[in-house]
């Protein structure tokens, strides 16, 4: 069976991680897989998209991302339309039609692909886009109205719709009123559970052997307790909460000197996006004024190898977004025996077991800090929670189970076209 994936931008986010994992698993089940995208930067992508594991085709890079800082959504629609056209054109030109096309993030291309191909189209909804761009003025509402209508109508054109969590499923039903009757299936993302774990000491050595990570290795070595935030440098991710929680601990604890906890804030960063550049500057400025400034390290666009080493070094992971649609980071952390402290809303409510594999707390500095203190004051508890976390991920969120599920959804959809 021939399966194509259509994704707008192959960066370093959770949606991209899902797409890469899904494509790899479908390919592992014996199907021919090809990925089409509107952007693929070899310096800001997952390794599988750049080492030959996946067959990646890029189109529409010549199109602008915005017009004078405006019209981002319309530009994204047009760029994705070019990607969809290339997908359809190459399939027709090579006389190798696709059986199923998997689309995510930009539903606009769903009806186009149905028009230009004979493939069955599966749409994976990470979260309704219209809720991510709440209109602030009457003019903005007028601008968003046709975009929101297109999103809802285009989503409904898919032959099958999958969502990433029960939380997103509920939001989908209340947001897309005209699609309330449409059946959706929850397919949670998954992570690799490593067979063996890297010790903290080995992780230090791994960082030290990389000339680009000398400072990182030194920072991690001097931290008796290291907390790690893994998220894109975007305002909606609430990274300032991690900084504020660390500052709260520094100001409200009797411990001082080298025994004070440290924090690494790492994640994807796109210097082309003005809002992200501005947010990054605000975070740096905020930390420069903090009492805990020497105990924080910012890292942009870390490699998977560095990320895994940081996970091995840390005491726990801080996951700061509120009402996150799903959140792959908690799974990545728990798979490596690290408890997670997250906000008590959205997707993490489905993945983290409170006081067993981590803590689900209010999104305020004191609540996060108290959970952090519970782990630093009792290392054996942190280790025990980590072991439970790994078992939890193995049982419910393994890559193998995810692969079987996504493959079955695609196979079932392909069979429908023959009935």
Label every model-predicted segment.
Residues 354-355, 359-366, 374-379:
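Conserved acidic donor-binding segment of nucleotide-sugar-dependent glycosyltransferases
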Residues 4, 208-237, 243-248, 263-265:
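Conserved donor-binding/catalytic core segment of Leloir-type glycosyltransferases
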Residues 167, 190:
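Carbohydrate-associated surface elements
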Residues 339-342, 352:
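Short hydrophobic beta-strand element within catalytic cores of glycosyltransferases
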Residues 322:
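Aromatic "clamp/platform" in nucleotide-sugar-dependent glycosyltransferases that forms part
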Residues 129, 140-161:
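Membrane-proximal helix-turn-helix segments that form the acceptor-binding/catalytic region
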Residues 267, 277-305:
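Nucleotide-activated donor-binding/catalytic signature segment of Leloir-type glycosyltransferases, i.e.
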Residues 5-12, 24-76, 168, 271:
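N-terminal strand-loop element at the rim of the active site
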């Amino acid at each position: 069976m021939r399966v194509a994936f259509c994704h707008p931008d192959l960066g370093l986010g959770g949606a991209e991680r899902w797409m890469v994992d899904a494509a790899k698993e479908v390919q592992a089940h014996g199907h021919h897989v090809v990925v089409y995208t509107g952007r693929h930067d070899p310096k800001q992508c997952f390794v599988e998209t750049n080492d030959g594991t996946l067959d990646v085709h890029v189109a529409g890079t010549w199109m602008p991302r915005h017009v004078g800082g405006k019209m981002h959504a319309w530009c994204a629609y047009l760029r994705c339309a070019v990607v969809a056209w290339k997908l359809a054109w190459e399939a027709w030109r090579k006389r190798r039609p696709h059986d199923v096309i998997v689309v995510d993030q930009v539903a606009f291309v769903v009806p186009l692909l149905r028009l230009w191909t004979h493939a069955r189209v599966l749409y994976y909804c990470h979260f309704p886009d219209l809720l991510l761009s709440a209109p602030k003025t009457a003019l903005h509402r007028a601008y968003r109205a046709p975009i929101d209508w297109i999103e809802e109508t285009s989503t409904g054109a898919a032959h099958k719709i999958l969502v990433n969590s029960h939380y997103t499923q509920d939001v989908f039903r209340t947001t897309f009123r005209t699609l309330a009757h449409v059946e959706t299936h929850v397919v949670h993302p998954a992570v690799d559970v490593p067979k063996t774990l890297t010790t903290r000491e080995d992780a230090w050595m791994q960082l030290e052997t990389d000339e680009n990570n000398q400072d990182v290795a030194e920072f991690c070595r001097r931290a008796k307790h290291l907390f790690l935030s893994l998220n894109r440098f975007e305002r909606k991710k609430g990274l300032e909460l991690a900084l504020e929680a660390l500052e709260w601990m520094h100001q409200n604890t009797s411990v001082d000197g080298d025994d004070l906890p440290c924090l690494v804030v790492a994640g994807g960063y796109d210097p082309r996006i003005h809002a992200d550049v501005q947010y990054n500057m605000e975070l740096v400025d905020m930390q420069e004024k903090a009492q805990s400034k020497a105990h924080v390290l910012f890292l942009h666009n870390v490699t998977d190898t560095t990320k895994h080493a940081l996970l091995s070094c840390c005491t726990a992971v801080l996951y700061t977004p509120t009402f996150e649609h799903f959140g792959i980071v908690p799974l990545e952390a728990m798979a490596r025996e690290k408890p997670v402290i997250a906000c008590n809303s959205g997707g993490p409510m489905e993945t983290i077991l409170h006081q067993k594999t981590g803590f689900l707390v209010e999104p305020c500095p004191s609540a996060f800090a108290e959970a952090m203190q519970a782990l630093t004051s009792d290392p054996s508890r942190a280790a025990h929670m980590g072991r439970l976390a790994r078992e939890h991920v193995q049982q419910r969120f393994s890559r193998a189970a995810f692969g079987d599920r996504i493959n079955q959804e695609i196979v079932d959809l392909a069979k429908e076209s023959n009935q």
